[in-house]
Each structure stands twice: as C-alpha cells, then as structure tokens.
Design a protein with these regions (language model features):
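Structural signal for the C-terminal ends of transmembrane alpha-helices
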Residues: 38-43, 202, 264-265
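Short helix-loop boundary/capping segments at the starts of domains
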Residues: 24, 28-31, 40, 44-45, ...
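Membrane-embedded helical hairpins/re-entrant loop segments and their flanking transmembrane helices
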Residues: 35-66, 207-213, 239-240
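Membrane-interfacial helix-loop connectors
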Residues: 69-128, 204-274, 278
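Interfacial helix-start motif at the membrane-water boundary
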Residues: 24-25, 63-68, 228
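Selected transmembrane alpha-helices and immediately adjacent juxtamembrane segments
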Residues: 1-34, 46, 50, 124-223, ...
Length: 300
C-alpha cells in the first residue's frame, strides 16, 4: 500500500473517480447484459412482430413511452437495444426507447422529484424534453434516413432455435449469452470511465462555471459537464439540483436531459455497435433538440 502514498494527489483523485464511476455503472451493465441474454433466448422475431404496432407513428410512440414500464439505466441500454435490433425490432422503435428509458422510468423520475425538493416541475420538464428528442429520432429513422444502424462488420450473435430446450437449459443459455455480453460491453465501459475520470480530474468544473455567463453558453457548458461526469441517470438529478443556483433552470434541465443520452461511456459503447453515421445523427439530434428546448424554457 506504500506505493499509493508516493502517487501524486491528482492520480489518486483520478483513481477514486474512476472506481466510483465503475462501481456506480457496473450493476446496471450487468443487469442490461442479463436482460439481453434472456431476450436472445426467450424472444423470437415472430413474437416481436406480433407485439409491435403496425403503424409507424404508433410504433415510434410505443418505443418512446415503453421505458416507463420497462426501465433501464443508460449504462446497460446499448446491449439491450442491440439485441432488440437483432430480433428485428425496427430502429424507429428501438432508438426512441434507448433515448427515453434511462429518463422516464419511475425510479429516475422519483429521484428527480426528490432531488429538487419534491417538485414535479423539473420532473415534467425532463420528461417532455426526453419525449421530444425520442419522437424526433423515431421520425427521422422511420421516414427520412436509413434505418439500418447496426455495424455491418460487427460481431453479431448467431441465430439459434432454443424452443426445443427445457426451461432450465434455456435459462442456462441466457446466462451464457449474458456473460459474453457483459465482458464485451464491460471493456468499453472501463475505457469510457477512465476517460471520464481523467477529464473530471484535469478539467476543473470551476473553469466551466466561470465561462457559462449567457444562456446559450450556460446550456452548452452543462451539456458538456453531463458528458464529462457520465453519471447514471438514477444519480444525476442530485448533482443537477446542486448546480441549479449557479446556472439556472434551463441549463440544469439540459444537464438532466443530455447526460443519460450522451455521455462518454455510453458514446463509446454505441460506437462499438452502431454505424458512425447513426451515432452522429443520434448525438447531433439529441444535442440540437436539447439546446432549442432549453432556450425556449429560458424565454418562457
């Protein structure tokens, strides 16, 4: 342990932040991987097609709102969405779910309500912002751009028929898939967490608060801060509430909306599974809509 006493304080801080991000995110990645494994084994493309609305607009709306009853943290959402896409869920349904599930689920909404002094105002603002972004992404994927978003050269799962296996063997196969998914996703989580910890350590937040004077700059700064901190959506409301007095309502809402959609660790995991063009579309759309929405909040 003596070696730690010889390390610079900044390195010790980096290690502490890195471990805190990993400890916070790892359970949700594990949960997402387990859910992904069970989707692989128990959900067939035929079941998916029977369950989804046939109308595109309704399918987009379904994907946007289903996160309320099917919660997931952004730390584990990418493997779940990847598996849904492999099961022939349309991207215009899956991606709205990816955008809103970490924000509109009851756990996060209640955490937001609690963090802001038992106020539904910020819960509503967060919900509406996430809803708008998800609907716009769904419309773009459903009617405007190419909806084939998975990488062509990615390592896709092989198609197997598990229907003939006993329940116990199917559960075992689901757990095998979950382990593979966990280690595949986990390495990108570790790298993303290390980058986030480095930026938190060597880019002091006081620099960001100093330059965030006007409304546009303040919104951009808070979005950048959310990207750097890479907090899980269950915890970010408490950080956002602590910044409310320094930045105001609109920038704080930008922090609450953009963080669960676009942070360092999530971006790296998306880049691993999705085409670069789609990742750019997702980040650009989410960021632009967040900025416009929060600017309108500032005017209103």
């Amino acid at each position: 342990m003596a070696i730690f006493h010889q390390l610079p304080d900044s390195v010790l801080q980096l290690l502490a932040v890195f471990l805190s991000i990993i400890i916070e995110a790892l359970p949700f990645v594990l949960l997402g991987s387990i859910l992904s494994g069970f989707i692989e084994v128990f959900v067939t493309p035929e079941k998916v097609q029977d369950f989804l609305p046939k109308n595109k607009v309704l399918a987009i709306l379904f994907g946007t709102l289903v996160g309320f009853i099917f919660p997931s943290c952004e730390c584990g959402i990418v493997p779940i969405i990847t598996r849904f896409l492999e099961k022939k869920v349309p991207s215009y349904t899956a991606i709205p779910f990816m955008a809103t599930a970490p924000i509109i689920n009851p756990v996060v909404l209640f955490a937001t309500y609690t963090a802001f002094g038992n106020s539904w105002y910020y819960v509503l603002l967060r919900f509406v912002g996430a809803f708008l972004i998800a609907m716009i992404l769904g419309i773009l994927l459903g009617f405007v751009v190419d909806d084939q978003i998975l990488k062509d050269n990615r390592k896709a799962s092989h198609v197997h028929d598990y229907s003939g296996l006993s329940a116990g063997k199917r559960v075992f196969q689901a757990l095998v898939h979950a382990v593979d998914e966990f280690f595949d996703t986990g390495r990108y989580l570790i790298f993303g967490s290390l980058v986030a910890a480095s930026m938190q350590t060597y880019l002091p937040t006081r620099i960001l608060t100093t330059i965030g004077h006007n409304s546009v700059t303040a919104i951009l700064i808070m979005m950048l801060l959310a990207f750097i901190l890479s907090l899980c959506s269950e915890a970010d409301a408490f950080i956002g509430a602590s910044l409310l007095s320094s930045f105001g309502v609109a920038p704080t809402v930008a922090f609450l909306i953009s963080g669960p959609m676009v942070d360092i660790k999530n971006l790296i995991m998306m880049k691993h599974q999705f085409k670069t063009r789609f990742v750019g579309l997702f980040v650009g759309t989410a960021s632009l809509v967040t900025i416009i929405y929060c600017l309108l909040l500032g005017v209103i």
